[in-house]
């Protein structure tokens, strides 16, 4: 999961 994945 990427930090930009909301």
UniProtKB/Swiss-Prot annotation:
It comes from the Eukaryota. GO terms for biological process: killing of cells of another organism. It is found in: Secreted. Expressed by the venom gland. One of its GO terms (cellular component) is extracellular region. Keywords: Cytolysis, Secreted. Causes weak hemolysis. Does not cause mast cell degranulation, LDH release, and does not have antimicrobial activity. Does not cause edema and pain. This is Cryptide TyPep-18. It comes from Tityus serrulatus (Brazilian scorpion). The lineage of its organism: Eukaryota, Metazoa, Ecdysozoa, Arthropoda, Chelicerata.
